[in-house]
Amino acid sequence: MAKEKFDRSKSHANIGTIGHVDHGKTTLTAAITTVLHKKSGKGTAMAYDQIDGAPEERERGITISTAHVEYETETRHYAHVDCPGHADYVKNMITGAAQMDGAILVVSAADGPMPQTREHILLSKNVGVPYIVVFLNKCDMVDDEELLELVEMEVRDLLSEYDFPGDDVPVVKGSALKALEGDAEWEAKIFELMDAVDEYIPTPERDTEKPFMMPVEDVFSITGRGTVATGRVERGQVKVGDEVEIIGLQEENKKTTVTGVEMFRKLLDYAEAGDNIGALLRGVSREEIQRGQVLAKPGTITPHSKFKAEVYVLSKEEGGRHTPFFSNYRPQFYFRTTDVTGIIHLPEGVEMVMPGDNTEMNVELISTIAIEEGTRFSIREGGRTVGSGVVSTITE
């Protein structure tokens, strides 16, 4: 069978289903693929058990089960992630294994918001999922219109509590199961949901359009030409003649100009996100730049040493710690290309953190590093990974 060509004319977005266990996330995922396929003939209709039997994957040493499906609407192509278990969501969102540009929060109209509904909203906030659309599921089981309105209000209030615009978030009432069974009245609700997703979740800015940033992996000097920093461009573009800043691990940022860009020993006019390059820097000595710093467009990223983070602590089975840790624990924080020692302060009322838990924490690094909200990191101890986290707020 010939492979279908990937259609680049449509914009692309990554989304996922979130919400409490048994509220219908996987059934909704199956219904979306089935209803959209039935209408356009594009994509693949997936059955519930095809999605539910997601294989385990290992991402940065952490075991996660995730189902990836794809489908398209009139205007967009979507990659959609659905996880079978609650722990899989926690790990997925924190490690960024499945980046989400937006999420569909599934709430059973028969039950209303439940503990994991709240936890997934909080996680979305902390890991930087920017937009949420709500699907009130199982509406075929609720006859009372007032009850539906009550549940909708509860969900909106809950979203507002975590700084999502609860009053403006689209809420679609439907039944994933009825739509999956081919009931036209409920299929229409799936189209209504996808219209809301198309309109409310903006097309993400592509990495190449963002301001330039490259983590430095290695540094060497070329006699007579100067110092070269190598690494993979994380975002944006850089061209010969651009001014860049060297950020992190030093008292102050240093500005320099890129006088050459090389890839695979060939000279380039410019490089963009995803390219592995060597950048020749004007007037920078070998001692003034090191692995773990970043090169960035001036003024776009600043070095910090204190932040709040959402962290998943690896279980013993995943090769993590065998014992809990307490406040003032001092492991290594691995950002992009380097380890920096940091001190952990646990939130009030949290005595200790057990392997396999997730927690919020305050971190104070012993030196500044280029970080921003949404930057991912690993926590390591003696070279092995014991945790995975994401910066939720910069505090200093």
Curated annotation (Swiss-Prot):
Residues 137-140 are annotated as: G4. It comes from the Bacteria. GO terms for cellular component: cytoplasm. GTP binds at residues 19-26, 82-86, 137-140. Its EC number is 3.6.5.3. Disulfide bonds: none annotated. Mg(2+) binds at residue 26. Residues 10-205 form the tr-type G domain. It catalyses: GTP + H2O = GDP + phosphate + H(+). The keyword Metal-binding applies. Residues 19-26 are annotated as: G1. Residues 61-65 are annotated as: G2. One of its GO terms (biological process) is translational elongation. Keywords: Cytoplasm, Elongation factor, GTP-binding, Hydrolase, Magnesium, Metal-binding, Nucleotide-binding, Phosphoprotein, Protein biosynthesis. PROSITE patterns: G_TR_1 (PS00301), G_TR_2 (PS51722). It comes from Bacillus subtilis (strain 168). One of its GO terms (molecular function) is GTP binding. This is Elongation factor Tu. Belongs to the TRAFAC class translation factor GTPase superfamily. Classic translation factor GTPase family. EF-Tu/EF-1A subfamily.
